[in-house]
Structure formats: structure tokens, C-alpha cells
Amino acid sequence: MNLHAPNAEQDDIEYVDVCAVDDLWDGEMDVFDVGEHEVLLVKHEGRFHAYDGICPHQSVSLVEGHLTEDGVLICKAHEWQFSVEGGQGINPANVCLQSFPLKVEGGRVLIGTEPLPKEGEA
């Protein structure tokens, strides 16, 4: 089952098993080394989301921030805000988080080793 719907073919993606589905409670997040990337895994409203774990502003680990009940991920350094649904910037609106493909199989969460192309990239 794929609980994150990327717009990319997933047949040739290499995935890494990072945790069990039950390891993260709703509203929790954790960071994992996946390939050469630090990837933030967030569970919100029963769905998993995977993003680059480093804030695009000043390279602060996003896992040190917090997730609001309404799905806003806030960086601890300068309170940049991102929607957990898709990684779109809220404050500032012109910046977004890099998404990673993920899937759930056999009660395990697997994250792709390479980020998905940003919108407009091939």
C-alpha cells in the first residue's frame, strides 16, 4: 500500500526499510538516514510523509521542530512553516520541502533512496 502519492514511476526506485508502521504514533516524526540523505518521516492523520530532513533555510534538522495538530511542520530555528500534506511552504510560501517516495509493505515503512523531482522538473 502506498500512503504517499508521488507523481513519479516507482518501478525503478530503490527503497530502504526504515521502521514499523507502529513505531510512529499519529503526530510524531523521526529522521532516518536513507541512501545519502537525512529523511524526515512524519505520520499525520494516519498517513506517512517523507521529506528532506533539513530545513532549506539554514540547514537545521526539521525533526527538532514541531508538528501542529492541523498539519503544519515548523522549523525550530526561524519558524519557517510547511504543510505536511505535500511539503508546500506556508511561511514563506515560495519554498517547499523536497519529497521522497515511500510505501508501506507488510507493516513496514520503506522510503526511496532518491528524492522525487520537484514540480516542473523532469
UniProtKB/Swiss-Prot annotation:
Record's note on what induces expression: Induced during growth on aliphatic alkenes (such as propylene, ethylene and 1-butylene), epoxides (such as propylene oxide and 1,2-epoxybutane) and chlorinated alkenes and epoxides (such as vinyl chloride, cis- and trans-1,2-dichloroethylene, 1-chloropropylene, 1,3-dichloropropylene, epichlorohydrin, and epifluorohydrin). Repressed during growth on other carbon sources.
Keywords noted in UniProt: 2Fe-2S, Cytoplasm, Electron transport, Iron, Iron-sulfur, Metal-binding, Plasmid, Transport
Residues annotated as binding [2Fe-2S] cluster: 55, 57, 75, 78
Domain of life (superkingdom): Bacteria
One example GO MF annotation: 2 iron, 2 sulfur cluster binding
Cofactor details (free text): Binds 1 [2Fe-2S] cluster per subunit.
GO CC, alphabetical: cytoplasm
Bilayer-crossing regions: none
InterPro entries named among the record's database cross-references: Rieske_2Fe-2S, Rieske_2Fe-2S_sf
Compartments it resides in: Cytoplasm
CDD domains linked: Rieske_T4moC (cd03474)
Required cofactor names: [2Fe-2S] cluster
Domain Rieske: 16-111
Family named by the database record: Belongs to the bacterial ring-hydroxylating dioxygenase ferredoxin component family.
Subunit architecture: Homodimer. The alkene monooxygenase multicomponent enzyme system is composed of an electron transfer component and a monooxygenase component interacting with the effector protein XamoD. The electron transfer component is composed of a ferredoxin reductase (XamoF) and a ferredoxin (XamoC), and the monooxygenase component is formed by a heterohexamer (dimer of heterotrimers) of two alpha subunits (XamoA), two beta subunits (XamoE) and two gamma subunits (XamoB).
Function comment: Ferredoxin component of the alkene monooxygenase multicomponent enzyme system which catalyzes the O2- and NADH-dependent epoxidation of short chain (C2 to C6) alkenes to their corresponding epoxides. Functions as an intermediate electron transfer protein.
Protein name: Alkene monooxygenase system, ferredoxin component
Source organism per UniProt: Xanthobacter autotrophicus (strain ATCC BAA-1158 / Py2)
Upper taxonomic lineage: Bacteria, Pseudomonadati, Pseudomonadota, Alphaproteobacteria, Hyphomicrobiales
Gene: xamoC
